[in-house]
Regions:
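A conserved ligand/cofactor-binding region detector
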Residues: 1-798
């Protein structure tokens, strides 16, 4: 695809859409024309690839996820298509900056954190490796939310991303489907047996939009199908005329709410109901389309699992198990046993957490009225499963394994029972699943559980986010690593080359200067690019322990101000969103901002430490922050982080991990060796033993002078008229994730970080080792394992 083709497409789009030439077009017009032109290029490639797929009749995978945090698409597509240079030169002829055009595109509001970014990385890697795959999710009108910080407090506003973000989407009105909610069930005996009729339901229209997924140097173009909810009947004039104003637009209101926001707060029953509707909406629409298309092509569903692999990404799509059963039994007339055989051969499930609150459970009283037929199918699945467990002599496990227990529907259990394979996302996480969280299931289903360690789209997180480093590496070791990240290990040959180490240091400084400029421009805060950039950017949750980081900063403040400590200057950089209904997480954000304010108001302390919280964290911000990091804070309580992928992106860009032996940190430790990572804190078994013994945070306060100093000081803190006694009270009475138990070890680890950083040659050797040994964490490796070991799909070249 060359310059002439892109040029002519953009010029034609400008003429047809706006009646202008590029010479007199506005920046927005050029942006829209670029988005449309690239979309059209991908549509043509997609058509060609689809023809090849139809001829090959190869098995395809379908990745179902509540979120896909894809990030900006224009640069990614130009990079993957190999036409970024041509686009830049073409636009510069007319005094347009390609970077300015890039910056017009909003991050699509389709995800929130690591779960969604992983899904996006996998679509990228699967397409780059020419595997046929489709993603399914919801077209959220307002995304998760736009985070604004006011006086240190998080506020949530609608993220109106579609105004400028819609131009990459393809509306497919030819594939609309109906999704049903509520109503009653009627059982009717027919010649072929008992039939269930669903009556008096509310009908919602699912309208599909496709986001085309490009691959690097690949003939494949795959699709992320996004469903938007619309009222099927629309506004009811008769009800309105009778004065029933609310009822007249009830269907519109239900539909509108379904695709409004990702993860509505579920602290109320209304919020829980909406989450149930969202999950069923996109699952039902997706499966209806898939089953219909398969039946149209083959005239049977007997071979469905031979051609279709369905993947449940966390528990949100778990209803797919019951919905596929509904379609097979109710719509296509299969008997239960045959339908169950097809279903369980088709589904696989990835678990992403051992956190109890994230292993979704829905009250029967809430679920049944919303989805009466789906509930009755789940009830039957549970009945048959429990009978089978009793036959195995394992009835004592039903408390843990039953799908319905204590009037709660356990979605993780439904996913496990309805899938042929279940995997965790790091070696440690998968080990915890089989020996603890799902031990009873592992005993019932030997061989069903396995591991696929997460991976990242290295072409985005190195090639696009850090072109300075990528270009340097290409010249030094060749460009093989772009296609296959294992090739980056060639960099190990230069670990003692002082020139290379200094070159890498210079590149890191460039990225730090770029981030410093961004912080100055957006937050009006000046930071020293020669200071240590200590970075913790991830979803705000107590188990991720941003609070532990904050406690250490308070410790440094106290030591600088009162005890003569003069540390190497350090800039602590945070970015994180707290869930809208998660008050403790919001309190921690306020605490971090107050620490920053306290430091800024102290002339002595601010020479040595600075705290910056960058609001509204998203992919585009990550692409600016991660390449600039010196220190990668991965400090979750051991045993709580399933894997993490931010740790991998930071490693790839030369940051040194400061972390616990948790999630993929364990595998980073194995990859780089103990000299190139800084580990602290209790390990998983020690955490479990301490919980079992009875964790008493007061004992740590009484026995650690450092902890006592910090907590006593926080008691005296008043910033902007606010005190933080509640932080101290929480830590001394609850401290669910053992910040105090790990605090002294964390302080020592931070001292080791500073000592290593001050030895410039040693630090850059550590940095190089992290870059050079990151190959195992490519998403290419991860998706290869899914494709071969779980989905059993093959590459298809167009």
């Amino acid at each position: 695809m060359g310059e002439k083709t892109l040029t002519s497409r953009v010029e034609t789009s400008l003429k047809n859409q706006f009646g202008v030439t590029i010479s007199n077009a506005s920046k927005r017009q050029v942006y829209e024309a670029m988005m449309r032109s690239v979309r059209d290029i991908l549509m043509e490639k997609k058509f060609s690839y689809e023809q090849t797929l139809k001829q090959s009749r190869q098995k395809r995978a379908y990745y179902m996820s509540m979120e896909f945090l894809v990030g900006r698409t224009l640069r990614n597509n130009l990079f993957n298509l190999g036409i970024e240079k041509e686009a830049k030169e073409f636009l510069s002829e007319y005094d347009f900056s390609l970077d300015e055009i890039y910056n017009m595109e909003p991050d699509p509001g389709l995800g929130n954190g690591g779960l969604g970014r992983l899904a996006a990385c996998y679509l990228d890697a699967l397409t780059s490796n020419e595997y046929p795959v489709t993603g399914f999710s919801i077209l959220y009108e307002y995304g998760i939310f736009k985070q604004v910080i006011t006086n240190g407090w998080q506020q949530e506003f609608p993220d109106q991303w579609l105004d400028l973000g819609k131009y990459g989407l393809v509306y497919r009105n030819d594939e609309e489907v109906e999704v049903r909610f509520g109503g009653e069930l009627e059982q009717v005996m027919t010649d072929t047996g008992l039939k269930v009729n669903h009556k008096n339901y509310t009908s919602i229209q699912a309208e599909p939009y496709d986001l085309l997924i490009s691959g690097y140097d690949s003939s494949a173009v795959n699709t992320l199908r996004l469903w938007e909810a619309k009222a099927k009947t629309g506004f009811n004039m008769k009800l309105f005329e009778r004065g029933e104003y609310s009822k007249s637009s009830e269907a519109e209101a239900i539909a509108s709410s379904i695709s409004k926001l990702l993860y509505p707060a579920d602290v109320t029953n209304e919020g829980k109901e909406l989450r149930i509707k969202q999950q069923y909406f996109f699952i039902s629409a997706s499966l209806q389309q898939l089953v219909k298309n398969h039946y149209h092509e083959f005239g049977t569903l007997e071979n469905f699992s031979e051609h279709v692999a369905l993947h449940i990404n966390d528990t949100h799509p778990a209803m797919g198990v019951a919905e596929l059963m509904r379609l097979l039994v109710d719509e296509y007339g299969y008997d239960w046993d045959k339908a169950w055989s097809i279903t369980t051969k088709t589904f696989a499930y990835t678990n992403h957490t051992i956190m109890a609150e994230a292993l979704e459970k829905w009250p029967v009283s809430l679920f049944q009225p919303i989805l009466p037929r789906v509930y009755s199918i789940i009830e039957e699945i549970n009945k048959r499963f429990c009978a089978w467990v009793i036959e195995q002599g394992k009835e004592y496990t039903l408390r843990d394994t039953a799908i319905i227990y204590d009037d709660m529907i356990k979605m993780a259990n439904l996913s496990i029972v309805g899938s042929h394979y279940v995997n965790g996302v790091s070696k440690l996480h998968s080990d915890i699943l089989v020996r603890d969280t799902f031990k009873a299931f592992n005993d019932l289903y030997p061989g069903k559980f396995g591991n696929v360690t997460n991976g990242i789209a290295h072409r985005r997180w190195l090639g696009q986010a850090n072109p300075e480093l990528a270009t340097y590496l290409e010249k030094l070791i060749g460009d093989d690593f772009i296609k296959d990240l294992s090739g980056i290990s060639k960099l190990n040959a230069y670990k003692d080359d002082e020139k290379v180490l200094k070159d890498l240091q210079a590149i890191k400084l460039t990225k730090k200067e770029q981030l410093a400029d961004f912080i100055k421009e957006t937050l009006a805060i000046s930071v020293n690019p020669h200071s240590i950039f200590d970075v913790q950017v991830k979803r705000l949750h107590e188990y991720k322990r941003q609070l532990l980081n904050a406690l250490h900063i308070v410790y440094l403040y106290h030591e600088i101000k009162y005890n003569g400590l003069r540390p190497t200057p350090r800039t602590f950089i945070f970015a994180a969103k707290a869930s809208s209904g998660y008050q403790m997480a919001k309190n921690i954000i306020k605490f971090i901002h107050s620490i920053s304010q306290m430091i800024e108001s102290d002339e002595l302390v601010r020479e040595y430490i600075k705290v910056v919280f960058i609001p509204d964290y998203k992919v585009t911000l990550a692409e600016i922050i991660l390449p600039a990091a010196d220190v990668s804070e991965q400090i979750s309580q051991a045993g709580k982080e399933a894997s993490g992928t931010g740790n991998m992106k930071l490693m790839l860009n030369g940051a040194v991990t400061l972390g616990t032996m948790d999630g993929a940190n364990v595998e980073i430790y194995e990859a780089v060796g103990e000299d190139n990572i800084v580990i602290f804190g209790l390990e998983t078994e020690e955490v479990e033993a301490l919980y079992a013994k009875g964790y008493k945070p007061w004992e740590y306060y009484n026995n650690s002078p450092k902890i006592k100093t910090v907590l006593d000081f926080i008691r005296t803190m008043t910033v902007g008229g606010m005190n933080f006694n509640f932080i101290v009270d929480y830590l001394l009475t609850q401290d669910h994730y053992m910040c105090l138990a790990d605090f002294d070890s964390y302080v020592k680890a931070q001292e080791r970080i500073e000592k290593a950083y001050n030895d410039s040659s040693k630090w850059m050797k550590m940095s190089l080792a992290n870059i050079a040994n990151s190959g195992i964490f490519s998403a290419d490796r991860s998706v290869e394992e899914y494709a071969k070991d779980i989905w059993h799909i093959k590459r298809v070249q167009g």
